[in-house]
């Protein structure tokens, strides 16, 4: 039967920001997940660059997954290039349709620095991303993220709801690599209590529909499905696998392993065990350890192994999407007698494709003008010399300068560069996302016009757009 080590690699610590969690809890969770070869999610709010490199003892506090949420707090070129996976948070299961809010009393000097905000001022994330109002806009953001980090997978976090199958299909067509289906449970770190109790639907309903529609549309093998929202036991993991999930996020359970006693004061900055507070006196009471978190996930993985063995299977892949292994039982009150779960338990026809992701690597997107820019600037950058490049652009050339920014962040200390280390003189109509996430050291001079999202996520670059002298606009 598949080993504990292999099963643990499918586990994820879901998005909980540095702000919702104390610095100690946030870092410990990342170290624990990295030690297991699993993944932790930074949540919305950035992460200190000192965590991007392994510690002297070999532990790694860098969150494998970096989240891009609606307010884009802490989202810089450096942040995006420190991840193996970039997650676009469209919504959160515990509070669907709502934004987020970090109260001012939680915004310490350190959190304000990471989020590029003001200490003591409440930070509000709007319900929508203001650059996503259609599936095409989402596809553009996925494209931009795959340019700023040429090696990272891109995931999209959705909320379980009726019709999610159609949405998931659109996300898959937009070239996402992973889709997260979030259920109504959870939301421990920073969700309003009224939403935690009354909003959302179970992950089982959303996961089953997303898996069925993706399978019927012959796209299931292109994407990974992950689910979260109250998963606690090995049985939960096995049921999620049978309903179609390949990865499993345990958030509240991980906090309990660190010492959470479920006082439900997460949003008030008064957590008595130092997990969801920024108060130094309360943070001093934090007693969580990496071993405790590793032990929890190890025991859950062991229970998964035992259930697999009892069913006669040797790998989790063998049961993914196998809803025929689930049966409805009558148990509980009279109000449950008429409950019909046939829609959830329907087995979709996968045809000749697998019921789980078989694509190796990520779903690649087309190159941009940057492929040529990197060739032209290579020698000068290797010598540390300034360079000026000129190009004629057209509106099909998207995310100009973004891949170049990625290369500079990875190879150079951009904080020490002159603003015009590389000058790009462009002429024509630039496509969407000109200078998206562009870093310090690049100067863009465009004579002409540009489409949407100019300077999205700008990380220090200079962008100058001037109309043509012959333009009728001036």
Give names to the regions the model predicted.
Residues 1, 7, 17-24, 28, ...:
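Alpha/beta catalytic cores of nucleotide-metabolism and tRNA/nucleoside-modifying enzymes
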Residues 9-17, 36-38, 64-66, 84-94, ...:
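Structural beta-strand/beta-sheet cores of well-ordered domains, especially the beta-sheet scaffolds
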Residues 21, 43-45, 392-394, 427-429, ...:
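Acidic/polar N-terminal loop/beta-strand segments that form early-domain functional surfaces
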Residues 79-82, 172, 382-385, 417-418, ...:
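Flexible, charged surface loops at secondary-structure boundaries
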Residues 114, 411-414:
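Internal, non-catalytic "lid/hinge" segments that mediate substrate recognition, gating
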């Amino acid at each position: 039967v598949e080993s504990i080590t292999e099963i643990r690699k499918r586990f994820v610590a879901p998005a909980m920001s540095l702000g919702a969690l104390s610095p100690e809890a946030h870092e410990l969770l990342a170290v624990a997940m990295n030690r297991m070869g699993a993944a932790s999610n930074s949540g919305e709010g950035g992460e200190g660059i000192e965590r991007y490199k392994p510690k002297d003892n070999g532990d790694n506090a860098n969150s494998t997954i970096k989240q891009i949420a609606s307010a884009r707090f802490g989202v810089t070129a450096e942040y995006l290039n420190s991840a193996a996976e970039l997650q676009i948070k469209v919504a959160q299961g515990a509070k669907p349709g709502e934004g987020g809010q970090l109260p001012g009393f939680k915004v310490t000097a350190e959190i304000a620095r990471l989020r590029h905000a003001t200490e003591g001022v409440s930070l509000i994330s709007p319900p929508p991303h203001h650059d996503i109002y259609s599936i095409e806009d989402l596809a553009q953001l996925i494209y931009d993220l795959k340019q700023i980090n040429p090696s990272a997978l891109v995931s999209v976090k959705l909320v379980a709801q009726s019709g999610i199958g159609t949405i998931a299909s659109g996300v898959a067509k937009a070239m996402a690599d992973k889709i997260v289906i979030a259920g109504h449970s959870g939301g421990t770190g920073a969700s309003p209590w009224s939403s935690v109790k009354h909003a959302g639907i179970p992950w089982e309903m959303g996961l089953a529909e997303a898996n069925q529609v993706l399978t019927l549309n012959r796209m299931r093998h292109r994407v990974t499905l992950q689910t979260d929202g109250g998963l606690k036991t090995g049985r939960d993991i096995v049921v999620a696998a049978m309903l179609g999930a390949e990865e499993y996020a345990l958030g509240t359970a991980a906090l309990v392993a660190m010492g959470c006693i479920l006082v439900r004061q997460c949003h008030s900055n008064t957590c008595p065990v130092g997990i969801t507070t920024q108060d130094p006196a309360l943070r001093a009471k934090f007693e969580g350890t990496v071993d405790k978190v590793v032990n929890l996930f190890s025991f859950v993985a062991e229970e998964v192994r035992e259930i697999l063995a009892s069913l006669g299977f040797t790998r989790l892949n063998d049961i993914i999407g196998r809803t025929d292994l689930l049966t409805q039982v009558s148990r509980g009150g009279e109000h449950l007698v008429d409950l019909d779960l046939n829609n959830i338990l329907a087995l979709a026809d996968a045809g000749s494709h697998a019921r789980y992701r078989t694509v190796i690597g990520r779903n690649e997107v087309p190159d941009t003008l940057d492929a040529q820019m990197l060739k032209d600037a290579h020698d000068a950058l290797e010598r540390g010399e300034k360079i000026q490049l000129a190009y004629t652009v057209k509106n099909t050339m998207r995310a100009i300068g973004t891949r170049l920014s990625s290369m500079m962040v990875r190879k150079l200390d951009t904080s020490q560069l002159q603003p015009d280390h590389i000058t790009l003189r462009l002429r024509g109509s630039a496509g969407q996302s000109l200078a998206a996430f562009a870093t310090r050291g690049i100067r863009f001079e465009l004579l002409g016009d540009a489409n949407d999202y100019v300077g999205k996520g700008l990380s220090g670059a200079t962008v100058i757009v001037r109309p043509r002298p012959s333009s009728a606009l001036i």
